[in-house]
Amino acid sequence: MFRPSILARELGEYDVVNVGAAGTFVVRKPRSRSEFRNALLRKLPFAAELVLFDGGDFLRLEAGNPFAPELSSPDVVRFVGILSKAVSVRVSLPVTFPPDGEWLVRVMESEGQFVFGMYRRHMKTIGYLGQIDKLFGVPATIRNWNTIAAIVRVLKTPPR
């Protein structure tokens, strides 16, 4: 069974911090991007598509607070979709899933490789989140805004 926390420890020379349970890592002692990518791929027990960002990208996300005007409620989760690569296609936003009736997923805006939205806690939501890949034409991974905030906290903490 794959355990991201164990993988983070195995990549100790890079001072990798595992954030959450889905394999989101903060690398606090980076070298070259290609060197880290190769080291990570060698340690993974399966094939994976990796998306690497500079920490400054997440610091700018937090500073810009894309959810500031939106009211929060316990049944609505704010998320960031991270696209596997920048896309040239412009998507007319906002988009809701399902398109009719009460929305379960609402994609509000996009900026570079980041997509911002909200979803309601419902059994059908996961299927609608999968539509983001189709909407933008590239694979996307979804992270709760709380995960982004946790990444920023790690980035703001001095390395060991």
Language-model segments: residues:
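Surface-exposed, charge/polar-rich loops and edge strands
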Residues: 1-160
